[in-house]
């Protein structure tokens, strides 16, 4: 067999064995994707015994390419919600997540100095202790540029030794906080639901009868606050006739308007217009329909709603716009993006015409545009390669192959589309790309680390590494957990999601979700902190490597 055939065969064997190991669960907890690392270690141990040599350059390429695929697909997945998570309710959650990341970085520096742990070893322990694989890749890359020898193997070993307690430590932290604070799970779930219902600002509807005589005879666009675009006037009922109003529709006293907007805004408009009307303005039984359509036509990407002139040409109103699961109040200045779901109100034939304009081709939501993917990856690699020179630093700071594609993916996913290019990926395609990338990366890390793993694990040095990893895992989690619970008054279920997200650990999230079956509190806080934490976990090992290298 050729060298390439041998490597591909072994990688496939590692993936099969590792994924099988990852699916083994004890008390509902398993290694998950981390099992691939241990599959690589086992196969590497066997190849070492039989004297099989693998080409280092080929392995290095596969490792780096896998990492690029993984971080890029993560960025595309979380990009739409990344910047939103930094605002409003996400501020507190992200603040505590930053606290966990910061404490772990401080502990790394202290252990490195106090116990004289080699830099490659402590960075590998750090990545394993926080169960973050891209962190390992970022650390390996910057240490290689600093001129270290045998970096990949040493970091891979220390990562693998610290990894198991990285998972166990999160679960232990959740359990201890629950015991110490005597948490009642049902009560916590109820309090979370009550709080969410109070804070929720979804769109509501209200039927208002126009009784203000000062507004009779005015056009719709002339009524107060119309230009603020905070309310949509989707239907108008005059006597028994239902019509779709446009900006030039003249209002009569007694007209019933169907308004869409936030509850507080609707109440304000009711005070201006008149009184709430207990009248049905349903399209059922009329010539009008209310239907949903998806924006998939590349010719309308980036176009403002007012440029489509839907009201003027087709007498169709967009009453709601759903973007990435968030309901928005559409206005004329809002630009359409691929995947936007529009709620259309109008005659059936007019709605069909509008459907043809915006696309509404649901099969496109399952198709993958390959050009934007490789364009994004290329831009990410270029960004990651740009050096930032700082005085006193021995090497330039770089985002690297882990950080560059992540940052570019976050930005492109937030933008959504440029011209006919769109950066939407179906969830199934994104998951496949992400899993292939991480499997390739962990397989190679395991193959490089496995030759001496067992000897190191059973040595006093290996036991010390496990201890250091336990400290880096446990102390930031338990300290932040106590602070968040006592001073932040954080809900326990949200806190469990925060701890899982701060360690970017899906197995821990699965455990947190099972604390209260069918409840979404943990998943919500996990998703809120995940994007920022992933970015910090990639940047922090590079900063630590350069700072500690410079100080030594």
Swiss-Prot record:
> Which residue intervals define the domain RCK C-terminal in the entry?
190-275, 277-360
The molecular function GO annotations come to: monoatomic cation transmembrane transporter activity
What topology does the record note for this protein and the membrane?
Multi-pass membrane protein
Major place of residence: membrane
From the Swiss-Prot or TrEMBL record, state where the protein is found. Answer: Cell membrane
Q: Which PROSITE patterns match?
A: RCK_C
Q: Which UniProt keywords are listed?
A: Cell membrane, Membrane, Repeat, Transmembrane, Transmembrane helix, Transport
Q: What does the entry list under GO cellular component?
A: plasma membrane
What protein name applies here? Putative transport protein APJL_0985
Species name: Actinobacillus pleuropneumoniae serotype 3 (strain JL03)
